[in-house]
Regions:
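Glycine-rich ATP-lid/hinge loop adjacent to the conserved G-boxes
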Residues: 112-122
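Acidic ATP/Mg2+-coordinating residue in the GHKL
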Residues: 94
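Conserved micro-motifs of the catalytic ATP-binding
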Residues: 4-9, 48-51
């Protein structure tokens, strides 16, 4: 596991809402081509965060591409941005088959494998481990929860820019 302090960040203060909107443009096309829906729910107001935009774009890309990969025709991936007290909150929700319970405890460890019925991809490789390291290097937290309607919810909390 990489120490979060070992990551060299190039911080910039940006509006998370605007950036996420930009970063999701290519995924809108991918979702449309695979018959999936990508729904965005974000406030009209700015949510300022200090992030390494290149590394954080990778975090979003990993979470959204994982969600699209496990989906099927007609499934929906939701990206929700909110502000809760001193944190920016980014949630990526899917209605895919979900994570097998035996994998949940090791989800953010490198090379956790899991075969899930109906998924196009059954391997959890380095992606979530690297995602966690990047989020933690930004002073943030990433959490996983089961989506009550089926699927997964990944929540990233980031401190608001001072």
């Amino acid at each position: 596991r990489m120490s979060p302090s070992a990551l060299q960040l190039v911080p910039d203060t940006v509006d998370l809402v605007e950036r996420v909107r930009e970063w999701l443009i290519p995924f809108q096309l991918v979702a449309r081509e695979s018959g999936e829906r990508l729904l965005l729910s974000m406030p009209e107001t700015d949510i300022p965060v200090t992030i390494d935009t290149e590394r954080f774009a990778w975090v979003l890309s990993n979470l959204v591409s994982n969600a699209l990969r496990v989906g099927s025709v007609g499934s929906t991936v939701r990206i929700v941005i909110t502000q809760e007290e001193d944190d920016a909150v980014l949630r990526v929700e899917d209605d895919g088959p979900g994570i097998p319970p035996e994998l949940e405890a090791r989800l953010f460890e490198p090379f956790s494998h899991g075969r899930t019925a109906g998924t196009r991809e059954g391997l959890v490789g380095l992606g979530l481990a690297i995602t966690r390291d990047i989020v933690e290097a930004h002073g943030g937290v990433i959490r996983y929860a089961r989506n009550p309607g089926g699927g997964a919810i990944f929540t990233v909390l980031l401190p608001l820019a001072k």
